[in-house]
Amino acid sequence: MITSENTDNRATNLYKPSDIEGKWQKIWEDDNLYNTDEQASNKEKFYALSMFPYPSGNLHMGHVRNYVITDLIARFQRFQGKVVLHPMGWDAFGLPAENAAIERGINPDKWTKQNIAHMKSQLKLLGLSVDWDREFATCDENYYVWTQFLFLELHKAGLVYQKESEVNWDPIDNTVLANEQVDSEGKSWRSGAIVEKKLLTQWFLKITDYAEELLQDLEKLNEWPERVKIMQENWIGKSIGTNINFKIKEFKKEKIQVFTTRPDTLFGVTYLAISVNHPLIKKISDNKILSKLENLKIYLQESKDKDQKKIGIPTNLIAINPINSKEIPILIASYVLDEYGTGAVMGVPAHDERDFEFAKINSIDIKQVIIKEKDKITSQLTNAFTDNGFLINSNNFDGLNNSDAKKHISEHGERNGWAENKIQFRLRDWLISRQRYWGCPIPIIKCTNCGSVPVNKKDIPVRLPNEIKISSNKINSLGSNQSWINTTCPKCGNLASRETDTMDTFMCSSWYFLRYPSSKSLTKPFEKEKINKWLPVDQYVGGVEHAILHLLYARFLTKALRDNNLFDIDEPFKRLLTQGMVQSAAYKNSITGKYISPTDIKDITNPKDPKDNSKLEVLFEKMSKSKYNGIDPESVIKKYGADTARMFILFKAPPEKDLEWGDSDVEGQYRFLCRIWKLFLDYSNNDITHEADKLKKENESSLLKSINIAIKEISNDIKNNQFNTAISELMKFYNSISSNLNYVNKDLRRESLMKFCILLAPFAPHISDEIWHLIGNSKSVHLEKWPVFDEDALKENSFELVIQINGKVRDKINVEINISDDEIKEKTLIRPNVKKWIDNKTIRKIIIVKGRIINIVV
């Protein structure tokens, strides 16, 4: 409980965050102040969530920004009288933990849990209003059992399947590598081996079944940043076009199908291009062609410029254009992707820049079939014509604009059986298999009789084995643990083996927000009624780097689980805020490309390389150990306090913009809190003079107006995520209180200070509670209601009248709004500054512009 005994801290006149912040954090925790009140059924709910952190071991300023923003929003919503769910957890599986454990020779579980404990203590230093009772980590058995349960639900719904897929394979370490483990030269980050492509049987989720809904429902997300929606729209990549079948001259029963959005250019097709793994390749027996093909595959694996160089290998096979029966060559092309469309494209050099370049390099005909102006033939093309226009060289379709021609040629193809209208998506199914130890085991048993059989739900979790072996700088995969692998088939009872792949960590992080409302449930992943109550998340906060994968996977799983009747919501996140990066000054030698630590620089105002005395380039870049520009949050909190760190993070830049760290800006926020501290301490010690003869109506009017302006502007700014301008308004409000406090009645003094406390509280919660108690309150300021502004108090009751003599400004005066013209003249003519300009002169005319100006013509 909060008592005067544990909150009275008037012994010092100095603001010392270390004296108050730990104290208030303990009080809040002891009083369960931020535990979600599930019994408050009469209150409106608000679910505030940050993207949960990976437990790397140390908090960085990017974390601080993310969690402080969400905390401010959660606190503001509590002040609105809402019951707030603001939880925290840990995205704990994955390759970084496995690699870190290998380097240290310990179990990833031990390393991860040590990091969680340390990072949790760091997060608590920030004074976050988190409900820690709902905490979990994705590596907890009581969490990943439900990840496996959801996998089985998706399997039952027909959304899980296996197929062969290409992976990055390290031939020295004999392991699969994630894309980020392959460097820019196509080499393994660990062994240095040239990474190979290898076909492995992998598990997939059918996210493509939801492509159309994922695309269409972006329109519902009107509180998401537009750029994130555009990124998802492009990733889903819907194309409306036509599938066209080309016969192959040499193989009468074979056809090549291509997808195109430009059937209007069909008469201009002069070649077909197929990918290096197209099924037609199997029909090729010419050793010279196959040798070139192998060289091309190696080039595509190794080259980072594969999209720049257009390599073509003639197959000596001929396709027949169905629209005009023309024979066209088939080439294997470096730019055709296996995974998009049909693995074959039609080449129209005259009307596609890539095809034009490819045709020039490979000596292929270029045939123009669209011109800009009707009946006006252009000279030979020097580059591709990609604008709209009219058809030429297209038989019966000549003269049509290309928009109409698309429709007519598609219909012609459908009637003749070689074309079909088709909607295609760029989105591919989600590959969730990982050949690593530290992940959620896939609950599948492989039986020689029954094939791949799902584990019975009563037998989950399939636990990770505790005993691991670290050899050759890697943790042996699950496949090397025979006692773990060997089991019996749930279907036939024969000896069988477990699936040795683990799940992509995105599988664990794509449903965690569903777990928080019932995080301690031992019988189900979540309770339907609680999901329907709390979801969607009202405010989700995280980096824009998660715009596609995490956010798209989370949307997909939500829709798939809804269709399994596990709850009724369509979208997981109502409102999304993607915060910018935190950047800091980095010092780079532009000649060597090396970064220099600021501790090695003698004069930071004129930075030079200590080795060669060359001038260093100063860059503001994302904080990084390798660039020596990281700022340790704990050291900042130790020096200035958590409230200062919070105020700086919120004030320095709008949340969606990148933020540049500056020590002077941090010190500026600290000084502001020091001034606040002194003001309230003086008031509590009766050091502010209150003589009745000093009371002035204009001061009271000014302060009352400032109170209401502050409430209105700060409220609107927080609602609109304009936290930096909200702090600017707090500063203005503070200045008004400081200027007027000696000259207003005691009730208004107290009202202004109390409302300032509440308005400050979401930004700087510790000092707010301390000064709240300094002025005589007993309960926490965080239990108060947010003040409401009085519209009448904002109405102007006076204005500044500009006084001109012969059109030149000579004076200004404040007058009441409803003043009459006669009163304006009277007040103006007695002003000393006016008298000296009109004495001994004849006033010819007085012009009054209502509410603005009086001009005296003499």
Curated annotation (Swiss-Prot):
Keyword line: Aminoacyl-tRNA synthetase, ATP-binding, Cytoplasm, Ligase, Nucleotide-binding, Protein biosynthesis
Annotated Gene Ontology cellular component terms: cytosol
CDD domains from the UniProt entry: Anticodon_Ia_Leu_BEm, LeuRS_core
Ranges spanned by the short sequence motif 'HIGH' region, renumbered to the chain: 53-63
Coiled-coil annotated spans: none
UniProt-listed Enzyme Commission number(s): 6.1.1.4
Protein name: Leucine--tRNA ligase
